[in-house]
């Protein structure tokens, strides 16, 4: 992911900064606790595509 692009992108919900998780290929919004996927080098910034970081896998 291009560092210049990361400087420009913000969370589409809160407009806050994002952190790049290289291993998971996601952009993380710590304020909203959401992870936006990066597919083929393209960040998918749709709120309905974000993964909720508050949900523990295997729980409802």
Swiss-Prot record:
Pfam families: Trm112p. One of its GO terms (cellular component) is cytosol. Gene3D superfamilies: 2.20.25.10. Belongs to the UPF0434 family. HAMAP family: UPF0434. This is UPF0434 protein mma_2578. It comes from Janthinobacterium sp. (strain Marseille) (Minibacterium massiliensis).
């Amino acid at each position: 992911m291009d560092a210049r692009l990361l400087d420009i992108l913000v969370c589409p919900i809160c407009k806050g900064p994002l952190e790049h998780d290289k291993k998971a290929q996601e952009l993380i919004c710590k304020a909203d606790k959401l992870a936006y996927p990066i597919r083929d080098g393209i960040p998918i910034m749709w709120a309905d595509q974000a993964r909720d970081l508050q949900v523990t896998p295997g729980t409802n």
